[in-house]
């Protein structure tokens, strides 16, 4: 049997028989490797990530497909660009943009060795602002990143930073299921308090991780550390951390304090962070510096300037779109025809009528209400789209319960599927 991807990823001796030449390994993961690759067509560099699907559980495979979907749906200068993906012989290949200056974790460790060489305030601010712009784009497109950490912040020689690796780890869903210790290969420094407490999470969990990362950029160390998970959890829930260096302004340090708030209902959204006067002023300075940067293309400048201009012209009141995380919203209603995937050995899709009303999901055989089955929204963990490559059907969404049970439904259209997911998320207080 031929090696997987032999016509796509080859070595220097492959000649014109492949699209990319493998130039060497740059990373190792639980299920495979990442390589620097060179395009045979134009000589440009990219990253080829190869994963062994045979070693993955069904959940891990869903995470891999989710990463592909998230990357493919993103088009932003501060997010690693998706190029293509292929699957052969139980192997998955994802080709994506190459960042030529390593990652932020490496940079922090390098600066922190010996006498710490702190970032200058404008350097730290511009790093943070670019990550905020990336996260604003992700959240505005109804996605979560779920794995924000310094190792996933990639650096380039142009000065642009790029967010990569969308939530391929087990981090959030497994933590909610209460299996933190057996899941993490490392200590979950960036995990939000609501996840340690096994509560529902939403985009505010990404914001917490962003706050931890900002502290790390400014302080050259993580705000919370301990010798074991129990100790780390205690520190995170207490919200105590060492003061940041005096080389940073009090206004900048207050941004960290404002983000690392234990209650997600009191934690700002990214849009609310942009309204902080210090950050708002920083955005204007960032645009000025961006326009003068000759290493960045005009097309990229235009995208970022347009986004910042929209942010600066918008107003977000503190109570706008406010909701309580984990509080059931009894005012949410939605109803319509769906197909439901049955359980057992003979799984099949059956037409059903689904509705959300008075804090309950009610499933019946038909619109007349025959054979009703109810589920309190208190028992619902979340809802999300299922990729076609996984469901083998269009417009499928999954509903996950607090007890770990999953149910799949097929909507009548893509728009209908999005409405169902959003309605369920609003009903359980996470959207």
UniProtKB/Swiss-Prot annotation:
Its EC number is 2.7.11.1. Belongs to the protein kinase superfamily. Ser/Thr protein kinase family. The keyword Iron-sulfur does not apply. GO terms for molecular function: ATP binding; protein serine kinase activity; protein serine/threonine kinase activity. Pfam families: PH (PF00169), Pkinase (PF00069). This is Putative serine/threonine-protein kinase A. Keywords: ATP-binding, Kinase, Nucleotide-binding, Serine/threonine-protein kinase, Transferase. Disulfide bonds: none annotated. ATP binds at residues 26-34, 49. Residues 20-279 form the Protein kinase domain. The active site is at 147 (proton acceptor). Residues 331-429 form the PH domain. It comes from the Eukaryota. Transmembrane segments: none annotated. The keyword Kinase applies. It catalyses: L-seryl-[protein] + ATP = O-phospho-L-seryl-[protein] + ADP + H(+); L-threonyl-[protein] + ATP = O-phospho-L-threonyl-[protein] + ADP + H(+). SMART domains: PH, S_TKc. Signal peptide: none annotated. SUPFAM superfamilies: PH domain-like, Protein kinase-like (PK-like).
